[in-house]
Amino acid sequence: MRTLLGVSLCALAVASFAVPFSPSLAQAGISTNPAPLETTGYSSAVEALSKYEVDSSRLALTRSQTQATRAFAQQMIDHHGRVKSDQKAVGGPDAGSALEGPLSEMLNSLENVPSAEFNAAYKRGQIAAHEEALKVHGAYAARGSELAERAKAQAAMPVIQKHLDAAHNLPSA
């Protein structure tokens, strides 16, 4: 399962930063195929994507000069912080470890992108991560191995869609 996640996130990283953003990226199969249906794989994928969204958003707060980008980044940090606190309160997993593999590479690329290109790269990464999160949650909600987790996955989808819609509206410059 870890290998499948690594391979799919590698494809996500390559597509996200090697290709200029276009609406067809989401249709190009850059995400996990198939999405994990066992709880462990699902949880690992969700934790990794969430960590990328937060870490890249912290970077956006220091690198972006655009108010809309900074506001979105703060929203991501705040929302994911609340979710993480809620998970800890009910004994959920802690995603405190460093990013690995493709998501780490995506974050490193974002750290090193020239300032003039930062907003566009951040936008691409957020769109890719949220599209992947929607796919992972949707697949698990439909066919996941644990009913309680399936309900949580389903409940998360409208929030992820809202974040994805907001990411699409971020400025590229």
PLM regions and their residue ranges:
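His/Met- and acidic-residue-enriched segments that coordinate or traffic transition-metal cofactors
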Residues: 2-12, 16-173
